[in-house]
Amino acid sequence: MYKRQDGTILHVAVTLRDHPIPIIGVNFGGKGFLAGLEDDELDMLLEIADGQYTVSRRMMLDVELVRNERIICTQSVLNDVVIHGGHVDCIGVTAYGDGVPITRFNGDGIIVATPTGSTAYSMSAGGPLVEPENENIIMTPICAHSLAGKSFVLAPGRQITIVPERIHDRPAILVADGGDSIALIRGDQIRIRRSDNYTLLADTGIRSFYETAFGKLTDRL
């Protein structure tokens, strides 16, 4: 599968979530953390077609939007869920783990990511990099206005509930894996938990996660 952005793989991952089929991406531009091959490594596709690869199993998240005690939307993600105030608005965010408050802050929003998604928006917002085959839930604030807005790396079994607050004239926004925006209103809750499904990525063994991160994130001296 050829790709220009990781969004292509994210779309395929959700499409195949009920089917254990390994995915391989070829990066033709950009950071391309999910791509197993670069555009000058196309000859490796023949070896992959011959079964010369290992499988990297990646955790996914299931997301539920709850409104007036009813689930009105469900999605699965490989990378992340983003709740934000739109282009201009600051919102309040309260996050719960298994019903217990974890953090509350005002800011632009919050990202809830998988280890695979730790190299995406969460990283840009100052979140930690987590080895992609680990199973953790990563919460990263977006431009928090207080010291309470810190990143958390949580156990995979936690059920996370995000409650956006201070929603006034404009709705807050929910985005799952960079897809379509969903408007949030006062009183909405977003419930997030580890999915029973996994994404399988074909791993050629050409480079490790650390080599990929170093090559894509380090400036040339």
Could you tell me what each predicted segment is?
Residues 1-2:
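Conserved small/polar residues in nucleotide/adenosyl-binding loops
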Residues 5-8, 31, 116-118:
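Short glycine-rich anion-binding loops that position phosphate/pyrophosphate groups of nucleotides
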Residues 11, 15-28:
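Gly/Ser-rich helix-loop-strand patches that form or flank binding pockets
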Residues 16-21, 39-44, 126-135:
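A glycine- and small-aliphatic-rich helix-loop capping segment at beta-alpha/alpha-beta transitions
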Residues 30-108:
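Catalytic core of DAGKc-family lipid kinases
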Residues 57-61, 77-79, 89-93, 108-110, ...:
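A generic structural signal for short beta-strands and their flanking turns/coil linkers
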Residues 83-84, 88, 98-101, 150-221:
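ATP/nucleoside-binding phosphotransfer catalytic cores, i.e., glycine-rich phosphate-binding loops
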Residues 104-148:
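Gly/Ser/Thr-rich active-site loops/lids in small-molecule metabolic enzymes
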